[in-house]
């Protein structure tokens, strides 16, 4: 089953005949594989690890699948397809990345849902591309076309990051946020509540949904001997976390994971501001899976602490998995949940 934007690409796939194609920021479908009906080869770069895992089993000698914020090579393509990101500040980065991999006068296709911000494309497209032209309007989605008319600046990741100083009892921490990462340029209220009530941890600790590494850096500033692992599903978040740790001279294992699937073994501590804030059924299911899985991966005497929107129905799930738990702090928006394994 193809998403609506992918269906619009298929409607216009004749423009890709015998092209070497790169698909950036693809969705959780098999559009890159479907394009092999017309394209000579397709490479796909996912910025969402779940999307990568969905496509990766289809890889072959004509379809190569990657996860990350950049490709591991400098290959050039006749066409680059960009899925317009839900986080609009990420769009200029994706256009710059597309330009790095296009042949001169190569074709840029940008697709996205009508309500997803793509209508602002004309203002966002850099001047090394020709003015965007609307090619199709269907399936509640828009498709724009352009071409590479000038040389784009090289991508330096730090140029796409903002920084701010976070004050902690142990001293200031530098937080690095890449474009499109949650709570860019400031500390969100949920994390602020969590940081003001950090537990004392030891041993192997997991930061689930690490984002830009705010929790990780604060933990390591206060408790530098921790063996910390930071996981996220978002490539830009993982890269931000690595930048934050490097900026503060800290070390942690940073890697992608779909839920807890790519972690192994048990942890002495699990701490998180989990990225489950929209209340959608699908998101709630992911949150419930995280709670259940994390309960299984907590060592004896291990500590589990998360912050969550107080209006979301997580209390019952948490109580069902952990039984007796404590609420160390709450405000009108967020609630802190704490549990220590027996």
From Swiss-Prot:
Enzyme Commission (EC) number: 2.1.1.172
Domain of life: Bacteria
Record key words, sorted: Cytoplasm, Methyltransferase, rRNA processing, S-adenosyl-L-methionine, Transferase
Catalysis: reaction(s): guanosine(1207) in 16S rRNA + S-adenosyl-L-methionine = N(2)-methylguanosine(1207) in 16S rRNA + S-adenosyl-L-homocysteine + H(+)
Any one GO molecular-function label of the UniProt entry: 16S rRNA (guanine(1207)-N(2))-methyltransferase activity
GO cellular component, one term: cytoplasm
SUPFAM superfamilies, alphabetized: S-adenosyl-L-methionine-dependent methyltransferases
Chief subcellular location: cytoplasm
Pfam families according to UniProt: MTS, MTS_N
Family in the record: Belongs to the methyltransferase superfamily. RsmC family.
Protein purpose: Specifically methylates the guanine in position 1207 of 16S rRNA in the 30S particle.
Quaternary structure (record): Monomer.
Annotated protein name in UniProt: Ribosomal RNA small subunit methyltransferase C
Organism: Shewanella oneidensis (strain ATCC 700550 / JCM 31522 / CIP 106686 / LMG 19005 / NCIMB 14063 / MR-1)
């Amino acid at each position: 089953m193809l998403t609506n934007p992918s269906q619009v690409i298929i409607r216009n796939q004749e423009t890709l005949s015998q092209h070497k194609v790169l698909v950036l920021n693809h969705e959780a479908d098999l559009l890159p594989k479907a394009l092999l009906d017309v394209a000579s080869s397709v490479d796909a770069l996912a910025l969402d690890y779940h999307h990568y895992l969905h496509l990766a089993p289809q890889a072959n000698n004509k379809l190569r699948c990657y996860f990350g914020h950049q490709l591991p090579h400098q290959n050039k393509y006749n066409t680059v397809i960009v899925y317009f990101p839900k986080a609009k500040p990420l769009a200029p980065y994706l256009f710059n990345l597309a330009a790095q991999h296009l042949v001169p006068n190569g074709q840029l296709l940008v697709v996205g849902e009508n309500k997803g911000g793509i209508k602002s494309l004309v203002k966002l497209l850099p001047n090394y591309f020709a003015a965007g032209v609307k090619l199709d309007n269907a399936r509640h989605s828009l498709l724009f076309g352009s071409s590479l008319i000038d040389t784009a600046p090289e991508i330096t990741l730090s140029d796409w990051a903002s920084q701010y100083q976070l004050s902690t009892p142990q001293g200031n921490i530098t937080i690095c946020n890449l474009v499109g990462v949650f709570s860019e340029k400031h500390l969100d209220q949920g994390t602020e509540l969590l940081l003001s009530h950090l537990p004392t941890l030891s041993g192997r600790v997991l930061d689930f949904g690490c984002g830009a590494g705010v929790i990780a850096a604060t933990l390591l500033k206060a408790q530098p001997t921790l063996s910390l692992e930071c996981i996220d599903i978002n490539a830009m978040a993982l890269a931000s976390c690595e930048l934050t740790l490097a900026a503060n001279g800290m070390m942690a294992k940073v890697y992608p994971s779909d839920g807890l699937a790519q972690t192994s073994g048990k942890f002495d501590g699990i701490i998180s501001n989990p990225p489950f804030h929209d209340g959608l059924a699908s998101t709630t299911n992911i949150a419930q899976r995280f709670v259940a899985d994390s309960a299984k991966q907590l060592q004896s005497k291990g500590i589990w602490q998360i912050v969550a929107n107080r209006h979301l129905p997580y209390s019952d799930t948490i109580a069902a998995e952990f039984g007796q738990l404590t609420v160390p702090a709450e405000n009108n928006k967020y609630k802190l949940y704490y549990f220590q394994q027996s």
